[in-house]
Curated annotation (Swiss-Prot):
Signal peptide annotation: none
Basic and acidic residues bias: start-end ranges: 40-54, 571-580, 811-822
Location of the region described as Disordered in the Swiss-Prot/TrEMBL record: 1-184, 200-910
Ribonucleoprotein listed as a keyword: no
Principal place of residence: secreted
UniProt feature, compositional bias: Low complexity: 10-31, 115-144, 169-184, 208-223, 266-280, 289-300, 362-371, 427-444, 460-475, 501-523, 550-570, 583-598, 674-743, 756-769, 786-807
Family from the record: Belongs to the fibrillar collagen family.
Annotated protein name in UniProt: Collagen alpha-2(I) chain
Pfam family, one: Collagen
Length: 910
């Protein structure tokens, strides 16, 4: 069995893809205008308030961007054939590990769940505006009790306004290109490490050099996902024994090199990565649960005429985009469909030359294999791997070759565990406003809200006479904004929208400077041989071998009796393999030669090379220079709570309905009549006590002003209705125009409680990053986080922009050719078989089995990498989500003091 070649050096790790962008948040839908007030109903018994509109289901969180495509695994070196007496071929240099694909862009968040249309407002009888107090009239005799009036018709619901244009979403801060992890050392400033140099050419024997001293630690790069393990190649057929070459003198020992290249100074922050393809919109949310029915409202008055619909309000200006909140990580959405591949980017600039590499020591020749049997035998099991040679000093990096063309992308590998979550960067600047998306469709009606608590009935005053209409009152002060509401349950994932076009290429960053090399480390201990691997599967049938020559004719035997022609016998089993011959003597060690000039970098070796055992860790190098503090990184992924949008301005106050005419006074204490239909909202009544601060809902878009109702004749003040339970505050709408001033009502008896302080105003656009502060002391390395769960294989992301080329290595001197290995001992010739008794001349034997395929030649050099495709254009903004949840009406204030008793009313209808 041949000597197993040393393992080749490991392939270079691909740089992790940049983090995908977070998709734009869909704008909130506009709040629909309130319907016109319905006709006021006659004095009836308190009707139950209308069910509040459902609360819209919160849209699903945007789908998470596609994970970066795992890098193409390095080619596995070709395993040497088990040629009898043949020296096992050197393993090829490992293939360069492909750079991981660019991380998929974070998908655009799905549409916000459609807001349920508010339930029809119960036609609440409007409270008549209180006229000026007249002089107390004489107490009249009570008239006959009137029957309850017929319930008024239900007021029509005004059409839901179209949502206003969405505020432009600022683009995300551009993502910098992550650097490759530098060697371990004191942690320098958070600079981007330089790119890794091209892998050096394996030495003559491929013996890995000892580990060099670790340089100063640069900023910790993002950990790329490991590529999948390459599949094990099929074992080749057993080759015919080759002739053993003559033993040559061993090559000279090379100078001790360094396993790791010099640590470069922290690189300048690279150009921002291109914008990823936005993900699809989420699916529409599900309808929320039905609320319970509200408590009975106050008594309605006689139905009035339907109000005239007011003019449509102008949409307000969209609020500024607030800063990104530091929320908890969001739940990963389903990956969107694969976006189109971006255009190829421009090739990067060639980096600065690297230091010259030293030549490694020549490896010790392996023992000669034992002779094998003659003929083409079946392939035996693979022997145990040979001992690793004494590691010679690693050669310094040679001249970096020009980038080859981009190879065909390999198959997707199984994604490795997720790396630790990086620190959240500062928020990026607000970008230019994008075009407004189309208006979302109206969502379905939601279930009714819960019943409000029924308040205590107010004191019923004596019916007063209808006074003349008072002058219009001045608008009341705006109540304090409610406290933020709790986060609603997460809705189902919305329908995924279309994928936008790819983004444009970012600018290319300048290459980093080359750092000084660290000291060389000591040689590591020689590793022990590993256990023998399992026998590989049988290889393909080889090509026919050369036809053997006819041997000399044997002596004529005695003619035997002619036997009957028998049937061809079964093929006998193949004999056992002969014993392995002893290893030949090891040739003398040649003199140590002087280090020859390092040769240029050769093409990548064939796939299948084994990686040599790592050398011992070198001494820690001196601390590297502090890196240049890079600009603020891109903002981190949105948390679970999401970024709170800007607080919308308060929606317009709709014109209050007009007061209905005063109906006939009923006898106090009469039996309650049937439940009346809730009347339309009345005009603005007496300012009640200030309600408690409600929970602000989701910020709605600009609402449209409600229709201006026609002011009707003032009606008598009805009995105060029961105070309903505080409704769920909806999202504050945009600030609308001031409504018409209402009539001045009498002051309330109780002063309302002071409301909670209002929410902060809209957050302005994020300013430009400030100047860089002084570099702080070097922090300690944090613990590496536990690997995250293995994510599902995402679709192929768009090809990212080409990173800056690595430093151009100095071309090394060509090394001297190594000495030829010792010639193996010729195999023992097999014995001639014993001549059998001559019989009848047999038939010609079958042609011998084809000879085994010779050892595969080295893999050709990889083609030059083609230019990286440019990213496509930025995708169109997603569709505008439906309107936000309409907030329910606040709780009614306490009733004012009863008016003076009026004269008795006429008898009611029978």
């Amino acid at each position: 069995m041949g000597i197993m070649g040393p393992r080749g050096p490991p392939g270079a790790s691909g740089a992790p893809g940049p983090q995908g962008f977070q998709g734009q948040t869909g704008p909130a839908g506009a709040r629909g205008p309130p319907g016109p007030p319905g006709k006021a109903g006659e004095d009836g018994h308190p009707g139950k308030p209308g069910r509040p509109g459902e609360r819209g289901v919160v849209g699903p969180q945007g789908a998470r961007g596609f994970p970066g495509t795992p890098g193409i695994p390095g080619f596995k070196g070709i395993r040497g054939h088990n040629g009898i007496d043949g020296i096992k071929g050197q393993p090829g240099a490992p293939g360069v590990k492909g750079t991981p694909g660019q991380a998929g862009a974070r998908g655009i968040p799905g549409e916000r769940g459609r807001v349920g249309a508010p339930g029809p407002a119960g036609a609440r009888g409007s409270d008549g505006s209180v006229g000026p107090v007249g002089p107390a009239g004489p107490i009249g005799s009570a008239g006959p009790p009137g029957f309850p009036g017929a319930p008024g018709p239900k007021g029509e619901i005004g059409p839901v306004g179209n949502p206003g244009p969405a505020g432009p979403a600022g683009p995300r801060g551009e993502v910098g290109i992550p650097g490759i992890s530098g060697p371990v050392g004191p942690k320098g400033a958070a600079g981007i490490p330089g790119v890794a140099g091209a892998p050096g050419i394996p030495g003559p024997r491929g013996i890995p050099g000892p580990a060099g001293a670790a340089g100063a630690t640069g900023a910790r790069g993002i950990v790329g996902e490991p590529g999948p393990a390459g599949s094990k190649g099929e074992s080749g057929n057993k080759g015919e024994p080759g002739s053993v070459g003559a033993q040559g003198p061993p090559g000279p020992s090379g100078e001790e090199g360094k396993r790791t290249g010099p640590a470069g100074p922290p690189g300048i922050r690279g150009s921002p990565g291109s914008r990823g393809i936005p993900g699809a919109d989420g699916r529409a949310g599900v309808m929320g649960p039905a609320g319970s029915r509200g408590a009975s409202g106050p008594a309605g008055v006689r139905p009035g005429e339907p109000g005239i619909m007011g003019p449509r309000g102008f949409p307000g200006s969209p609020g500024n985009v607030g800063p990104a909140g530091k929320g908890i990580p969001g739940i990963d959405g389903r990956p969107g469909p694969v976006g189109p591949a971006g255009a190829r980017g421009e090739p990067g600039n060639i980096g600065f030359p690297g230091p010259k590499g030293d030549k490694g020591h020549a490896g010790i020749a392996g023992a000669r294999g034992a002779p094998g049997p003659d003929g083409n035998g079946e392939q035996g099991p693979a022997g145990p791997p040979g001992f690793q040679g004494i590691p010679g000093p690693a050669g310094t990096a040679g001249e970096a070759g020009k980038p080859g063309e981009r190879g065909i992308p390999g198959e997707f590998g199984i994604p490795g565990p997720a790396g630790p979550r990086g620190e959240r960067g500062p928020p990026g600047e607000s970008g230019a406003a994008g075009p407004a998306g189309p208006i979302g469709s109206r969502g379905p009606s939601g279930p009714p809200g819960p019943d409000g608590n029924k308040g205590e009935p107010g004191v019923i005053g004596a019916p007063g006479t209808a006074g003349p209409s008072g002058p219009s009152g001045i608008p009341g002060e705006r109540g304090a904004a409610g406290i933020p509401g709790g986060k609603g349950e997460k809705g189902e994932t919305g329908i995924r929208g279309e994928i936008g076009n790819p983004g444009r290429d970012g600018a290319r960053g300048a290459p980093g400077a080359v750092g000084a090399p660290g000291p060389a480390g000591a040689n590591g201990d020689r590793g022990e041989a590993g256990p023998a691997g399992p026998a590989g599967p049988a290889g393909p049938r080889g090509s026919p071998g050369e036809r053997g020559e006819v041997g000399p004719a044997g002596p004529n035997g005695f003619a035997g009796p002619a036997g009957a022609a028998g049937q061809p016998g079964a093929k006998g089993e193949r004999g056992a393999k002969g014993p392995k011959g002893e290893n030949g003597p090891v040739g003398p060690t040649g003199p140590v030669g002087s280090a020859g000039p390092s040769g240029p970098n050769g093409p990548p070796g064939p796939a299948g090379g084994r990686t040599g055992f790592p050398g011992a860790a070198g001494r820690t190098g001196p601390p590297g220079p502090s890196g240049i503090t890079g600009p603020p990184g891109p903002p981190g992924a949105a948390g679970k709570e999401g970024v709170r949008g800007p607080r919308g301005d308060q929606g317009p106050v709709g014109r209050a309905g007009f007061a209905g005419e005063k109906g006939p006074s009923g006898e106090p204490g009469g039996t309650p009549g049937p439940q009346g239909i809730i009347g339309a909202p009345g005009i603005i009544g007496i300012p009640g006590s200030r309600g408690e601060r409600g929970i602000p809902g989701v910020a709605g878009s600009i609402g449209e002003p409600g229709p201006i109702g026609i002011a009707g004749p003032p009606g008598a003040r009805g009995p105060p209705g029961a105070v309903g339970a505080p409704g769920v505050n909806g999202a504050p709408g945009e600030t609308g125009r001031d409504g018409n001033p209402g009539n001045d009502g009498p002051p309330g008896r109780h002063k309302g409680e002071r409301g909670y302080p209002g929410n902060a105003g809209p957050v302005g656009a994020v300013g430009a990053p400030g100047p860089h502060g002084p570099v702080g002391p070097t922090g300690k390395h944090g613990n590496r986080g536990e690997p995250g769960p293995v994510g599902s294989v995402g679709p192929v992301g768009a090809v990212g922009p080409r990173g800056p080329s690595g430093p151009q290595g100095i071309r090394g001197d060509k090394g001297e050719p190594g000495d030829k290995g010792p010639r193996g001992i010729p195999g023992i010739k097999g014995h001639n078989g014993i001549q059998g008794i001559p019989g009848i001349a047999g038939q010609h034997g079958d042609q011998g089995a084809p000879g085994s395929v010779g050892p595969a030649g080295p893999r050709g050099p990889a083609g030059p990498t083609g230019p990286v495709g440019k990213d496509g254009r930025s995708g169109q903004p997603g569709t505008v989500g439906p309107a936000g949840v309409r907030g329910s009406q606040g709780s009614q204030g306490p009733a004012g003091p009863p008016g003076p008793p009026g004269p008795p009313g006429p008898p009611g209808p029978s």
